[in-house]
């Protein structure tokens, strides 16, 4: 038998009485006293097939069939006696006339169903080709394909050109570590896999393309987290002569279409905007989740004079005292529970987590004794606290207060059910500092990358007060995740040279690394700006998943290993000799 008349998921009541030919995998087999039932699965769904004893040849073969066998079946669609309302094909079944076993299967190491979620992820990654058979994962990749095509079509309608940029490129010292590729024809020299197409897309603007996009593969040798992978995909966009307001509007239109055509959700535009400083002050994060409140509250004035030394010392040294008001949670948290919260904030540098519970009579807790009636009134007013609320405090330098309370806010939001998981809140975070000073290195680092344009009105401060200079940079945030980041780019050589100098490059180093770019700026480079959206992360959020690996067909583990192919792996001495390489493995 060859051919296929129907996909399994399309065999519904409209096909009753029709002869069909189906192909697929056996999801489940049941032998019920003569009748044998199979659930046959393909990429569109599952349909029940019944083998009757009267058809001896097909019935005999069905007795030998097991889960995940690949079958070719001919039969007739009939009304099902016991319908299954949970699946689209549940009103019908196929009475088998003929069956061919196209391939048998060993017993799988885990069930090809949602029960596999209980299996260790390492085992599922080792047998990724089996894990990918699960309908929920296949649905995620259909979503990914659809979203990619929506964005590609949208950008094509806006007259953007899709241009591929090099994968073998030049190593640069900024950002994460590069993945290096040795050159055989240039012994001792290396290419780098691109961390982004940043330089090439800017050069395409110099080339006069004006509007570019690419669904680009990027590579960063950095420590992994649940939402990071060493190789990832971004929707990369660059445009000339478009001001930032127009770029915002274009991206909002694109995301509106993605949300509508994938999830059927309408979202409101324009997206809210929030300066970086406000995001850090209110939410303790530059990617705030605005689906719930529980904002950080500055209580410096309220606690001044209370006499609690920890607060006083933090304020005297230029730090902050901020609080979270966990509404109605006083009775939910025991001292032991609060100790666990303190251990959590310690991860982010907080040396302690002070707390009080608000009662009808005032305050209760370890630091309540420091608050007299007047101080209690000030604190209650500052935090809008009521009886039954739990107030938690961190006193430290601003960065530690933001990091620790911001992380605690997110943790409590999830654990207390404060987040509406059906909501998608987009947000532009703007006005980032251009650079950050790292005390450990005694130097400035670019907050985004070295090619980000400072605000024109701040250029005079680039050498004298660089820490106060703001960038024309913006991040698109969705539900507490950075979905993408972009900026207006430097396009004048003198500003780029000043930026490199600020970042600690000597003139020689800047020319060696980026001389080609600065020379290009001397040939009539237009003003340009762009953005890159993380496709893997976008799909993770659209699909309601929490692990980025679920959106990548063949992902790496947290240790950057591929358990399926056993990569990375040693290579032969002959290969190394051909590349003029000798390995020297560090002893751990």
From Swiss-Prot:
Residues where L-aspartate binds: 174, 220, 448, 489
E.C. designation(s): 6.1.1.12
InterPro entries: Aa-tRNA-synt_II, aa-tRNA-synth_II, aa-tRNA-synth_II/BPL/LPL, Asp-tRNA-ligase_1, Asp-tRNA-ligase_1_N, Asp/Asn-tRNA-synth_IIb, AspRS_core, GAD-like_sf
Keywords assigned by UniProt, alphabetized: Aminoacyl-tRNA synthetase, ATP-binding, Cytoplasm, Ligase, Nucleotide-binding, Protein biosynthesis
Gene Ontology terms for molecular function: aspartate-tRNA ligase activity; ATP binding; catalytic activity, acting on a protein; nucleic acid binding; transferase activity
Binding site for ATP: 220-222, 229, 482, 534-537
GO CC terms, sorted: cytoplasm
SUPFAM superfamilies to which the protein is assigned, alphabetical: Class II aaRS and biotin synthetases, GAD domain-like, Nucleic acid-binding proteins
Compartment list: Cytoplasm
GO terms (BP aspect): aspartyl-tRNA aminoacylation
Record field: catalytic activity: tRNA(Asp) + L-aspartate + ATP = L-aspartyl-tRNA(Asp) + AMP + diphosphate
Ranges where the record places region Aspartate: 198-201
Domain of life: Bacteria
Pfam families for the chain: GAD (PF02938), tRNA-synt_2 (PF00152), tRNA_anti-codon (PF01336)
Enzyme class per UniProt: ligase
Gene3D superfamilies (UniProt xref): Bira Bifunctional Protein, Domain 2, GAD-like domain, Nucleic acid-binding proteins
PANTHER family, A to Z: ASPARTATE--TRNA LIGASE, MITOCHONDRIAL (PTHR22594:SF5), ASPARTYL/LYSYL-TRNA SYNTHETASE (PTHR22594)
Family per similarity comment: Belongs to the class-II aminoacyl-tRNA synthetase family. Type 1 subfamily.
Subunit structure: Homodimer.
Main function: Catalyzes the attachment of L-aspartate to tRNA(Asp) in a two-step reaction: L-aspartate is first activated by ATP to form Asp-AMP and then transferred to the acceptor end of tRNA(Asp).
Name of the protein described by the UniProt record: Aspartate--tRNA ligase
Species of the source: Exiguobacterium sibiricum (strain DSM 17290 / CCUG 55495 / CIP 109462 / JCM 13490 / 255-15)
């Amino acid at each position: 038998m060859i051919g296929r008349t129907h996909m399994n998921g399309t065999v519904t009541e409209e096909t009753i009485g029709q002869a069909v030919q189906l192909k697929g995998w056996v999801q489940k087999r049941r032998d019920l006293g003569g009748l044998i039932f199979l659930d046959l699965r393909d990429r569109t769904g599952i349909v029940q097939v019944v083998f009757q004893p009267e058809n001896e040849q097909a019935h005999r073969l069905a007795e030998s069939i097991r889960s995940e066998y690949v079958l070719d079946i001919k039969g007739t669609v009939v009304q099902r006696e016991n319908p299954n309302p949970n699946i689209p094909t549940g009103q019908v079944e196929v009475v088998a006339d003929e069956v061919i076993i196209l391939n048998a299967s060993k017993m799988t190491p885990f069930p090809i169903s949602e029960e596999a979620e209980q299996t260790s992820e390492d085992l599922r990654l080792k047998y990724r080709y089996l894990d990918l058979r699960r309908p929920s994962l296949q649905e995620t990749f259909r979503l990914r394909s659809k979203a990619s095509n929506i964005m590609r079509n949208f950008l094509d309608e806006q007259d953007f050109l899709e241009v591929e940029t090099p994968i073998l490129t030049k190593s640069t010292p900024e950002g994460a570590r590069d993945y290096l590729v040795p050159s055989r024809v240039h012994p001792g020299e290396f290419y780098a896999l691109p961390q982004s197409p940043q330089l090439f897309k800017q050069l395409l603007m110099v080339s006069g393309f004006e509007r570019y996009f690419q669904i680009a593969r990027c590579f960063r040798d950095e420590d992994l987290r649940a939402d990071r992978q060493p190789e990832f995909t971004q929707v990369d966009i660059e445009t000339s002569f478009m001001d930032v307001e127009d770029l915002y509007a274009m991206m909002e239109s694109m995301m509106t279409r993605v949300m509508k055509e994938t999830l059927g959700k309408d979202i409101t535009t324009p997206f809210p905007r929030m300066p970086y400083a406000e995001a850090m002050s209110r939410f303790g994060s530059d990617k705030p989740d605005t689906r719930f409140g529980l904002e950080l509250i500055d209580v410096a004035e309220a606690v001044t004079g209370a006499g609690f030394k920890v607060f006083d010392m933090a304020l005297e040294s230029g730090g902050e005292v901020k609080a979270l008001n966990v509404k109605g949670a006083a009775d939910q948290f025991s001292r032991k529970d609060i100790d666990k919260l303190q251990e959590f904030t310690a991860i982010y540098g907080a040396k302690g987590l002070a707390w009080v519970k608000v009662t009808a009579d005032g305050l209760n807790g370890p630091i309540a004794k420091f608050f007299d009636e007047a101080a209690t009134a000030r604190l209650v007013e500052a935090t809008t606290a009521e009886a039954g609320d739990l107030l938690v405090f961190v006193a430290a330098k601003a960065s530690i207060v933001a990091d620790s309370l911001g992380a605690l806010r997110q943790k409590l939001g999830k654990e207390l059910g404060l987040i509406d998981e059906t909501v998608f809140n987009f947000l532009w975070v703007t006005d980032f500092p251009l650079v950050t000073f790292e005390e450990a290195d005694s130097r400035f680092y670019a907050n985004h990358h070295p090619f980000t344009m400072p605000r024109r009105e701040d250029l005079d401060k680039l050498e004298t007060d660089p820490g106060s200079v703001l960038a024309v940079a913006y991040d698109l945030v969705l539900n507490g995740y950075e979905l993408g980041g972009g900026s207006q780019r430097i396009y004048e050589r003198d500003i780029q040279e000043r930026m490199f100098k600020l970042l600690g490059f000597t003139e020689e180093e800047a020319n060696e690394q980026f001389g080609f770019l600065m020379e290009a700026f001397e040939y009539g480079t237009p003003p340009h700006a762009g953005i890159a959206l993380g496709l893997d992360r976008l799909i993770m959020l659209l699909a309601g998943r929490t692990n980025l690996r679920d959106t990548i067909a063949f992902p790496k583990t947290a240790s950057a290993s591929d358990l399926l192919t056993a990569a990375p792996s040693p290579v032969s001495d002959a290969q190394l000799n051909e590349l003029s390489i000798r390995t020297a493995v560090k002893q751990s």
